[in-house]
Amino acid sequence: MLKKDNDPLSAAEIVEFPIPEAQYEETIRALNGIQSGAVVEQDCFVADIGTAGCPALERLIGTMANVDELDWLGKQLESFDRYELLQFNAAVERFGLSAADELIDLSFRARDVTVVSDFTDLEKIGKRHYLTVHGACDPKELENLDGKETALALISGQPGYVTRYGVVYDNGIKLEQAYDRKHLPPIWMPESCIMELKLRATGKDDPKKQEWVQLPASRMKLERAMLRVGIASCGEMQMLVSDSRFPDEVNCALDFERESLFELNRLCQMCSNFKEQDFVKLGAVCQMAKPTCAANIRQLAENLDQFDFAP
């Protein structure tokens, strides 16, 4: 539940995070109606939170946040598995964090802490700790690891911090600022995303002054991302592709130096229900038809059924 301030008489809006793409513009307009939902400012007072999978988020209650920060955080946590959520919850309490921007920073390091909720299986504790510290290892190496010895070395060698989620061993991590409080950092790419772009103002190479957008997205979300980077129009913007589900034939047909972000978005919206074989077919059609821009490719995608294709 978000409000403009902590005044009990202030109007409130109930917002689901991450915000469903189809509801994004409606949500922002509703927040604007209660004088919150700004592009950069932390002007949303978190009056209440209901969350079953991540109770640590309740620490946000009573703080001010930006709506896109909360949306980003909700999306990031959506990608966490059960143990990663446990790590995040425990790390929030271990480091005493409560602000949305702090939690965004923590989301990049929470996977580096070891959390022990049950000390009865030292073998399992040791192997999980080893994976946490090393990120990954050869299955044979893990099988041959003495998990009990590794667990005992952890328990005797590090101070443990007791939280309601278990004992946290922080493995000496240092919390670093991944988020500069204005430009939202890159995030995992969900299956619904067709293309991920990095946006920055033309002629500006400052790595801190850039935004990542995932297409398709609502037009308002794209416009807000542009404003955070200081871009007033597509003509002032440089786009770099960081990931794409389109085949090479489509990507090579697009001139990202001249293409419109909004035309690219319309193309991705048109292809949002495509299966893998549809993308392959679109690539073959583009190879034959030689389109020169996103609008041309969108027209081909709209009429894909009119083409015969034998893969």
PLM features: what roles do these ranges have?
Residues 1-21, 188-219:
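Short, extreme N-terminal segment that most often corresponds to the first beta-strand
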Residues 27-144, 148-152, 166-192, 208, ...:
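Mixed-charge (acidic/basic) macromolecular-recognition segments
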Residues 162:
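Histidine-centered catalytic/metal-binding microenvironments
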